[in-house]
Amino acid sequence: MHDYQKAFIEFAIQREVLKFGQFTLKSGRSSPYFFNAGLFNTSTTLAQIGHFYAAALTSSPLQYDMLFGPAYKGIPLVSALAVTLANEKSMDVPYAFNRKEAKAHGEGGVIVGAPLKGKVLIVDDVITAGTAIREVISIIKANGAEPAGVLIALDRQERGQHQLSAIQEIEQNYQIPVTAIIQLDQILEFLKSDPHFSDNYKQVAEYRAVYGVQS
């Protein structure tokens, strides 16, 4: 586990973005942990999340020409990442995001920001069913650009109705990489290293054994 990953887990727990207990997911499964990126909702947390996304991006082999944030949660995330790359890496990276509905007046269309061209890296919080990512990939291709990959905060490493996770399906169907700041395996490693979380480690490990995908 990289230092930035450990720091991100600690930060997420501190901000109660990552919680442990019993939570019912949209799938109906009872999960021993819950991750709510919507709680990164202050200026300080937004600056911090931009730093963690940038750390994951620069540690990855992802190649890209610009950034794209799917509406709505991806919009502040891609903005925070773009600002962090400028401040910490002196990189001037174009970015854009989409509207849920096309605008008929003014500049019109569904895209806000830089024109979509070249290799486009999609930035979002998590991938659950993958519907939003598939829609964005269609938008990118329709504009003559190429989806270069997806950068998210957490990979739950959890299968859907079949044997693959939504992330694995995206990777297979579109032949693009999905990179996460952390995976569930890193959360387990963190919990195992701290006796305070021994009960949580056991519960999350059992959940991973039942619903997890092969890493």
From Swiss-Prot:
Orotate binds at residues 34-35, 128, 156. 5-phospho-alpha-D-ribose 1-diphosphate binds at residues 26, 72-73, 99-100, 103, 105, 124-132. GO terms for cellular component: cytoplasm. GO terms for molecular function: magnesium ion binding; orotate phosphoribosyltransferase activity. Pathway: Pyrimidine metabolism; UMP biosynthesis via de novo pathway; UMP from orotate: step 1/2. It catalyses: orotidine 5'-phosphate + diphosphate = orotate + 5-phospho-alpha-D-ribose 1-diphosphate. Its EC number is 2.4.2.10. Catalyzes the transfer of a ribosyl phosphate group from 5-phosphoribose 1-diphosphate to orotate, leading to the formation of orotidine monophosphate (OMP). Belongs to the purine/pyrimidine phosphoribosyltransferase family. PyrE subfamily. Homodimer. This is Orotate phosphoribosyltransferase.
